[in-house]
């Protein structure tokens, strides 16, 4: 790809006092681009002594860092590179031709971690002494909607040609007959009382029903089979004849005065 069309503005930085343009072109060729001679890069020497690049923010397509020393201020430089790069711009870091042999082996792993923490993406080591990274095309704080994948429910294939069994064919004539209820000779009404000429046994059952209530004998001589009748409703059985009366002592007779119901006024 033509480098002049791909990179409109190129910035080259180095910690040396002099940087030949040929070294900048060689670094750009490592990206697989042709026609680098058409580029007109802006070169900054002794960049380690600068706190800020004399370049406007988001104005550069490609930043090439060529460094000789291993202790260059990478943290400060990455922030400046991010500032001057356009969204989606590329940075290329490589060691100088005058660097010590084997120094890149120690520099590359450390650079990858620092570039990642600084906010770069698509970090890639091209050679033992060259590393490439990109500035993300999105901005910090930007948001976008996630497309929800709509999964279609599985369709059930129904074979209408298959033989279906009629449910009614499984019932016999006896199953379809309504059951006959046993009818008594008493008139069945809402009260269900036995008639005068009852012969079904309802009259005998009604005679056996015990009506709960207090007799005069129970009031005068209270007796308790369970021993809890005089303790109150909380201790009485559900069928206790004394239910509803206040607590009393068994065998004790309570006498009221003659003027108990007389008005005080």
Swiss-Prot record:
GO terms for biological process: iron-sulfur cluster assembly. One of its GO terms (cellular component) is mitochondrial intermembrane space. This is Anamorsin homolog. Residues 186-200 are annotated as: Fe-S binding site A. It comes from the Eukaryota. Monomer. Component of the cytosolic iron-sulfur (Fe-S) protein assembly (CIA) machinery. Required for the maturation of extramitochondrial Fe-S proteins. Part of an electron transfer chain functioning in an early step of cytosolic Fe-S biogenesis, facilitating the de novo assembly of a [4Fe-4S] cluster on the cytosolic Fe-S scaffold complex. Electrons are transferred from NADPH via a FAD- and FMN-containing diflavin oxidoreductase. Residues 226-240 are annotated as: Fe-S binding site B. InterPro entries: Anamorsin (IPR007785), CIAPIN1 (IPR046408), SAM-dependent_MTases_sf (IPR029063). Pfam families: CIAPIN1. A motif (Cx2C motif 2) lies at residues 237-240. Keywords: 2Fe-2S, 4Fe-4S, Cytoplasm, Iron, Iron-sulfur, Metal-binding, Mitochondrion. [4Fe-4S] cluster binds at residues 226, 229, 237, 240. Its main location: cytoplasm. Signal peptide: none annotated. It is found in: Cytoplasm; Mitochondrion intermembrane space. The keyword Repeat does not apply. The C-terminal domain binds 2 Fe-S clusters but is otherwise mostly in an intrinsically disordered conformation.
């Amino acid at each position: 790809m033509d480098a002049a069309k791909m990179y409109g503005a190129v910035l080259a930085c180095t910690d040396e006092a002099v940087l030949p343009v040929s070294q900048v072109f060689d670094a750009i060729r490592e990206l697989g681009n042709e026609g680098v001679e058409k580029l007109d890069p802006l070169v900054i020497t002794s960049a380690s002594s600068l706190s800020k690049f004399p370049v406007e923010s988001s104005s550069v397509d490609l930043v090439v860092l060529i460094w000789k020393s291993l202790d260059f201020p990478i943290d400060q430089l990455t922030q400046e590179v991010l500032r001057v790069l356009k969204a989606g711009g590329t940075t290329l870091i490589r060691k100088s031709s005058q660097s010590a042999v084997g120094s890149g082996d120690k520099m590359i792993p450390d650079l990858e971690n620092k570039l990642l923490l600084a906010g770069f993406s698509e970090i890639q080591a091209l050679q033992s002494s060259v590393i490439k990274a990109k500035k993300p095309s999105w901005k910090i704080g930007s948001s976008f909607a996630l497309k929800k994948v709509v999964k279609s429910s599985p369709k059930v294939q129904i074979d209408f040609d298959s033989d279906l069994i009629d449910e009614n064919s499984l019932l016999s004539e006896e199953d379809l007959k309504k059951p006959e209820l046993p009818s008594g000779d008493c008139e069945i009404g809402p009260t269900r009382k036995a008639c005068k000429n009852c012969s079904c046994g309802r009259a005998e059952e009604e005679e056996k029903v015990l009506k709960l209530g207090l007799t005069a004998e129970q009031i005068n001589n209270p007796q308790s089979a369970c021993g809890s009748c005089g303790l109150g409703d909380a201790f009485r059985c559900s069928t206790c004849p004394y239910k509803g009366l206040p607590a009393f002592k068994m065998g004790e007779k309570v006498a009221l005065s003659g003027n108990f119901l007389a008005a005080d006024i």
